[in-house]
Amino acid sequence: MTETARTTIDASEIEHFSRIAAEWWNPQGKFRPLHKFNPTRLAYIKEKICAKFNRDPNAPRPFDGLRLLDIGCGGGLLCEPMARLGATVIGADASTTNIEVAKIHAAQSGLDIDYRATTAEALAEAGEKFDVVLNMEVVEHVADVDLFMSATSEMVKPGGLMFVATINRTLKAYGLAIIGAEYVLRWLPRGTHQYEKLVRPEELEAALAKGGLRLIDKLGVTYNPLADSWSRSRDTDVNYMVLAERPA
């Protein structure tokens, strides 16, 4: 009997995001929460990369010479600003529909981004290495978290960074990120997140350590409904980000 090969692909997740792929660049559409969240995560990413690689954050292209992977890139909401900051960007997503949308938008924006319809494990198997890996809002959608974290960790060069953003597996997160955001406020299509697939910080930290990475920062990200904006926080009960490095 042949053993089934492990994969990070969850077919139902790919189908879900492919179905709404045309919405990626509509700031008032189904991905509105990501558009609102983007400035906060972009500021954090830029700050930490510039500090790590001794770059001037005020320079027009502070990421020049850095090779960056955005895994689970969707329509390219992070890839495009990373490219504008000077990084050599590879955007990977298991949904060919997402990649088609991302390619079209990058071409319209005059940006040179290497978009690939592929998986983390395929990239790792090919020996790809990066100065920075962005693993943002993806881990809660994959079929095999251990395989996914192993593959993404493997691609971080010595001295390189990996950013991970996801949702905690708590009752508070269930109430706010699933019931509130999907069923009450209708910010996201129903079924975007499944509670049992959410990942706790300690589980993520264990996976990073297993992959040879060292945790260097952890923070929460909270939404202010009055200001309709996101900000950094100490509260990791719902949305949170971690930053890890591979020792040089």
Swiss-Prot record:
Pfam family, one: Methyltransf_23
A GO term for molecular function: polyprenyldihydroxybenzoate methyltransferase activity
Enzyme Commission number(s) of this protein: 2.1.1.222, 2.1.1.64
Binding positions (S-adenosyl-L-methionine): R41, G72, D93, M136
Entry-linked Gene3D superfamilies: Vaccinia Virus protein VP39
Keywords attached to this entry: Methyltransferase, S-adenosyl-L-methionine, Transferase, Ubiquinone biosynthesis
Family (UniProt): Belongs to the methyltransferase superfamily. UbiG/COQ3 family.
PANTHER family: METHYLTRANSFERASE, UBIQUINONE BIOSYNTHESIS O-METHYLTRANSFERASE, MITOCHONDRIAL
Protein name, entry field: Ubiquinone biosynthesis O-methyltransferase
Taxonomic lineage: Bacteria, Pseudomonadati, Pseudomonadota, Alphaproteobacteria, Hyphomicrobiales
Gene (UniProt): ubiG
